[in-house]
Amino acid sequence: GADINPLWLGEEPSPKLHNINAERDLPELMLIRLAFNRQLPILGICRGAQALAVALGGKIQQDIYDEYIREEETVEKKLSKDKTVITYRAATLKHSQDAERCEATHSVTLNKSSVLYALYKEERLMVNSFHHQAVKDAGKHFRVTALSPDGVIEAIESSEFKPIMGVQWHPEWMGEEGGKLFQWLVGQSNNFYLAKQLHQRILTLDTHCDTPMFFPQGVN
């Protein structure tokens, strides 16, 4: 899809910015916020993962081949001992492949405490790649759960245990392996449906409700 307009983030456009689509940006960002507030399960793919971050307080990198990936190096000879110098570097892998969409072209490493790891039971996945932008800062509502070997954020998940996930690759082209993510989404959607049916019949009074939603009785 088109790049997300950096003006949504209070940034001026980089010379490397591609086409933008204002008619798409606004409804997507609004829908994400509405779905988030209603606890709806969400799976963001590629631009969708970036839109999740932007809509909920995170940031994206306009072009991953500019220096933005943070590194910390301890320099003992040039500086006083244990003083830390923060440096930044650019992505080094090819993230916009020329290979067919069904071909995996680089790996990602999964956080072992993530939903992704629970689904795949592997610490390393091979994925396809079609992007020049990526999540830069996941924000307070998400945590980073997958990285490429060069440090680009490849997946984010809710830090609040909501059924929300974003992946930078395109699982819809990855056959059976990609299908696991859609099975997860269907399963979470079914759980939401069952919870909603329950709350239509039973009014739950709880100071910590895991499935807050809009009730037909008029209770929000």
Per-region residue spans from a language model:
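Glycine-rich nucleotide phosphate-binding loop and flanking beta-alpha elements
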Residues: 2-5, 49, 211-213
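Glycine/threonine-rich flexible loop motifs
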Residues: 4-23
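Short glycine-/acidic-enriched loop or helix-start segments at secondary-structure transitions
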Residues: 5-9, 52-55, 156, 216
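Amide-donor transfer/coupling interface in amidating biosynthetic enzymes
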Residues: 20-40, 65, 69-192
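Catalytic nucleophile loop
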Residues: 33-61
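Histidine-centered divalent metal-coordination motifs
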Residues: 46, 131, 170, 208-210
